[in-house]
Amino acid sequence: MQCYTELISPTGVTHALAVPFLSATANNLIVARTSLLQIFSLRDVSLSALDTEVRPAQHRQETCKLVLEREYQLPGTVTDICRVKILKTKSGGDAVLVAFRDAKLSLVEWDPERYGLSTISIHYYERDDMTRSPWASDLSTCGSILSADPGSRCAIFQFGARSLAIIPFHQPGDDLVMDDFGSEPDYENRVEGNSRSHEAKDKDAAEYQTPYASSFVLPLTALDPSVIHPISLAFLYEYREPTFGILYSQVATSHALLHERKDVVFYTVITLDLEQRASTTLLSVTRLPSDLFKVVALPPPVGGSLLIGSNELVHIDQAGKTNAVGVNEFSRQASSFSMTDQSDLALRLENCVVERFSDDNGDLLLALSTGVFALVSFKLDGRSVSGISVRPLSGPSKEFLASTASSSAFLGNGKVFFGSESADSVLLGWSSASSATKKSFSGSTSNDESEDDAYEDDLYSSAPAAMTDNPQNQPSNSSVAAFGDLRIHDRLSSPGPIRDIVLGRSSEASSRDTKDGVLELVAAQGSDEGGTMVIMKREVDPYLVASMAADTANSLWTVSLLPDNNDQKRDYVILSKQEKPDKEESEVFVLEDKLRPITAPEFNPNHELTVEIGTLASKSRVIQVLRNEVRSYDAVWDEDDSDERVAVNATLVDPYLAIIRDDSTLLLLQADDSGDLDEVTLSEDVVSQKWLSACFYSDNAGFFTAPFASILFLLNQDHQLYVYRLPDFAVISVIEGVGCLPPILSTEPPKRSTTRENVLQIAVVELGDSYSSLPFLILRTENDDLVVYKPFFTNSKELTGLRFLKEANHTLPKTPNTTDELQSEMKPLRILPNIAGCSSIFMPGPSAGFIFRASTTSPHFIRLRGGFIKGLGCFDSPDKGFAYLDSHGLHLAKLPEGTQLGYPWIMRTVPIGQQIDKLTYVSASDTYVLGTCQRCEFRLPEDDELHPEWRNEEISFLPEVNQSSLKVVSPKTWSVIDSYPLEPAEHIMVMKTMSLEVSENTHERRDMIVVGTSLARGEDIPSRGCIYVFEVIEVVPDPEQPETNRRLKLIGKEPVKGAVTALSEIGGQGFLIAAQGQKSMVRGLKEDGSLLPVAFMDMQCFVSVIKELKGTGMCIFGDAVKGLWFAGYSEEPYKMSLFAKDLDYLEVLAADFLPDGNKLFIVVADSDCNLYVLQYDPEDPNSSNGDKLLNRSKFHTGNFASTVTLLPRTLVSSERAMSGSDKMDIDNTAPLHQVLVTSHNGSIGLVTCVPEESYRRLSALQSQLTNTLEHPCGLNPRAYRAVESDASAGRGMLDSNLLLQYLDMSKQRKAEIAGRVGATEWEIRADLEAISGGGLGYL
């Protein structure tokens, strides 16, 4: 019984789409990251905050940033997205058609009332009658293509081997081609004057129940009998009827059979008659190059389509005229098609992405698989294309895109987005000067043309007419001028693809962390020259600058004060030390080079309890709110002595101070110009209310009302949230039902509100970075739950349209133990205006942590490492870090340089400049050893006696192979301190750190780095391998670089026949086992450096994974053909014995053990993104006396796994609390192991064993959530996960992504679901904490 939890969602961008989605005039970017759908808006910001990314020549320009609006975890894998303009949408913008794996389509729109997606329809094409042919390929093994007509008249979805689904869309009137539904898709050029009124469109929409007509499925052979092997298709521009071009072949293309199947590709243009469900072939072009793989439709002024091949580009216009250019010397050898020769460019077009970057000309930006950009220009002769030219982009293009692009989107105004699965995705742009340069080459349309010619000029830009004098050079010159100002607007960072992971000792300078055994997860990320080390942690682990003892202190505040004499700003830290239950002493420290105590006799002389400390009067006065008085640093305002009310909550924003007293009344003070405080007279409506909490918000951006207004949020005892504008105290809005915690807070009370949460504090705070900070409403409950709401307006920012959308927060607070309960009372939330460049909020207490948000991410909670945090405060300058108070004392700390706060885990990246395939950590030397590779040219060996003709090979465009090397990285500076190159064409297949026996006499054991390599020189030559044994030794360092005191020393080298594909430590005598060729051999290291074989096992195929259950001798062998083998190793005598096999022949990519009590499970990841749980149970009758591994369950993750690693599991807070309260020994029920799964798309998952009782509760909860929740895009989580289990003893794996959505429900819905499940809410919360990653307590 296991549960799969996705700790980090997929990060690699697979698809991108530019569309006006939130409104008709919006500029949005929709990004798909495998199963994560994100909706961004483009926001222009001034360059005053951007000094690092923009060059001085562009200081007068604005830059553009991506701001995340919403994101959705989809129970499905996105395969394509396209935009569709339908009759009527809720937002007025376009709709989006999303294609999923297994032939599903969802039509979605934006709903401004809910500020989220609304599913219009979902279309399934996976029925048996669609693929009932017994020899047809399975849908999961076939690709799919989605394309929409530019006029939004229909969309086509090619799925399976040769099936085509056509979905017609209703359009206004009988004529489908109208001005506002024209063939030009660019929303920035949409015609303003519509020929029909909006009322007429609404009338047309009312005539149809759905925006689409009935779809139908045809085989491709029904359109053209010769379409046997489809390659690519796309709808074309400038056709009155829906028309698409399809690239196909009648026989399968093959590079190996090129001499027989040369130029066998066809290109056909087919127009559709949607009413008659018929088609007509307009033109067909034959004998095209066999390496063509993609069709790109080109808008005016070029028109037609661009066919992309591995070695050439081919343009075909509307009349079937072809123009081609070859970009390497193989274009002539691979094809006889007529083309222009540009073979001197030596470009490789595999996996390239092409996108236009301007509306003024037809030039295209080509992103190659290496990250290099090239410019594709068309020679226009009037309306006809007479030639193509390609020009590589000179300059540091690697700074823009580090590796292969996977998708692209043109966003208008000189902005192009390139998504990547193997590097950061980038938003590129050009300066306005370059746009003017390009426009200078465009001619103007003469005024005496006819109306028909004017309409054609809308389709065909007049730019080519001005280029006819020098058609070859002018487009290139304008484009080169444009590229001179190329720059990066924004990035979407990605820690994927994750190729390998290792655990290492934390590199932070914190001595107590080392004692606590804090580790960090280091991953090898990126491809090609974008290789990077990523350091990940679950919690904020700050760098301690200074510490001091403060045993009796229980609260902390930080203030930055501006002296009256305009002297330099000074930062202070104020501690409160409790003397008695109602008395405390305040100590003041000034922050200089270190904390220096100062004498402040007037500061809290009566030793009252402090409620809040802040500044007013433009930071010239320090205000201290005590229980019975409010004090300024030189002026005091005292309450009436006869008034025994005391302050319990305070909030302040210049020049106001609001205090909630113990009788739930409000006291409002205002500071005058001199800093003195005066009481503000309140209206009777405010005085008569009983208030629970108050919070000020300075609306500098004018989100709620006029800019620079002060907004006061008040929560009363009926859980109504009043929003007031000061100084006139006008009511902006009254939000109902706050205590019910519904998904959307509004002025309407919730329908079912019998159950409420006890909300103790509210806070409205800006969250974000320097590019985008937005206000959020934070609610803190009595259980330390933080509920985050995002405000939005439903109708043009009218006050009645103010609503709050609940953001997902799946971090559960820790259950306090006995020690924590003895700590001081609940500390209020602390607003942090600037911490590491981000505005944030901090929650003290046993579950202390921050809520961070970046412009491209949603708010998320990250804990601060440590125990009970009593208080934390930051300073005005982020360079000074922050101060916090815990049980160890007072600390000044900073976040490590380069820390990324945009993910649920803390991350830092260390660029290496080469692709990192493997990495390992050496604890003895505290270093990391990397196995990197770089591309190098490959020549056939000239000394081969069997092939003397290879010596006569004449080729300049050589193939490339990987050449590996080893690098030593010091975590002190995260720099490479040593390197060891391997032979040419030698590639590292596996690398691990092992404790090996180095002496047969003394039996001494030391940590060694064992490397297995493969030396492949081509298909005709058998591969060889080698086993290297290295040790990291200590040497004399460079005096200026003390971290260079480590070097690699080669201890042994053992060449073997066959590639070394897997390694593992085995047994208890310091031996290793290596998979070499088709054998797995146990070897021991001798003193002379040789590796002596002692036992072996014959394998049928090349082994991809070997794992040993440490110290037991039990190991697994896995490969992609013969499945998984479970074997054992004995030392007396040395022997390998086969125990059991997987008879299902799984395609094993990665695997590891998962012990659960007295049960032994094996987790296997296959090539179809599935996880299998196998069990070795010889007592089960189905195991054939233990010869068969039992397949207990199957679970579809949707992520292509790269590693599966067994890790120890720590107890979560609820388990520790139960073990502490119950004197019985119940630790046996808590699982002690878990498996971490990393993927190529950057996601990280966790497989956790679940006890029987918890499994029953969670399984019932999952069933309830599957049936009751509204799933995005209308998908079915049960069908997506495709859970299969052994009916006799197996249990299906649980889906934590679905289970954790229970936390996002309202209080009433939680109580109802818990009642149906038959459990209490506390039991469900404890179960969810156990599966949500809390067992990784050492990270």
From Swiss-Prot:
> Among its keywords, does the record have Cell membrane?
no
One GO cellular-component annotation of the UniProt record comes to: nucleus
Task: Answer yes or no on keyword Nucleus.
Answer: yes
Gene3D superfamilies recorded: YVTN repeat-like/Quinoprotein amine dehydrogenase
What GO molecular function annotations does the UniProt record carry, in alphabetical order?
RNA binding
Pfam (any one) = Beta-prop_RSE1_1st
Could you list this entry's UniProt keywords, alphabetically sorted.
mRNA processing, Nucleus, RNA-binding
Disulfide-bonded cysteines: none
Location in the cell: Nucleus
Q: What does this protein do?
A: RNA-binding component of the cleavage and polyadenylation factor (CPF) complex, which plays a key role in polyadenylation-dependent pre-mRNA 3'-end formation and cooperates with cleavage factors including the CFIA complex and NAB4/CFIB. Involved in poly(A) site recognition. May be involved in coupling transcription termination and mRNA 3'-end formation.
The molecule here is called Protein cft1
Organism of origin: Emericella nidulans (strain FGSC A4 / ATCC 38163 / CBS 112.46 / NRRL 194 / M139)
